Amino acid sequence: MPHSDLPFRALGVLHSARFLFNKYGFHNVGVDRIIESANTTKATFYNYFHSKERLIEMSLTFQKDGLKHEVISIIHVQKELTVIEKLRKIYYLHADLDGLYHLPFKAIFEIAKTHPKAYQSVVDYRNWLINEIYNLLLTTNSNASKQDAHMFLFVIDGAMVQLLDPNKPDERKRLLEYFLLGFG
């Protein structure tokens, strides 16, 4: 069921779960805590989501769909931007603890073994993003490779890891500039 077709109560549960998963992690948040936070009943929860695993899948799909929409907009709609400007926007869209990518990034480390179907949606998104970045790089550099697109994603992931450490300075700009040196 598409998110736009979910009733208000189900959307409330979905948003509460996304917030709690982002803040505390997938393993530290149980169904009872989500139900309490969403101010709903167990019957409502199980009617729409059937299980915590299904809720995790839907939460990640919600984030993934939002990210895809933004990336497509940056690459294909915002024609006035240069490739470097588009890469910058995509980078900062992802390298943000308050952004849509934080939950899928967290899922990489927390749910691979316990929720393989939900984890696969994150893998699918990352592969999609690599292809989009690769095609974007090809528009100005015919020698661009898939490895360049992979490296861009690794730079995003590195920035996220640094942001998660409160004792490290925010070096997102420096990481991105280092990557862009090869394309500027």
Could you describe each region identified by the protein language model?
Residues 8-17, 34, 59-63, 67, ...:
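Generic hydrophobic, amphipathic alpha-helix propensity
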Residues 58, 72-99, 152:
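Hydrophobic alpha-helical connector segments
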Residues 65-69, 97-100, 115-140, 146-150, ...:
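Amphipathic alpha-helical packing segments from all-alpha helical-bundle domains
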Residues 76, 90-98, 106-114, 178-182:
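Helix-loop "lid/cap" segments that line or gate small-molecule binding pockets
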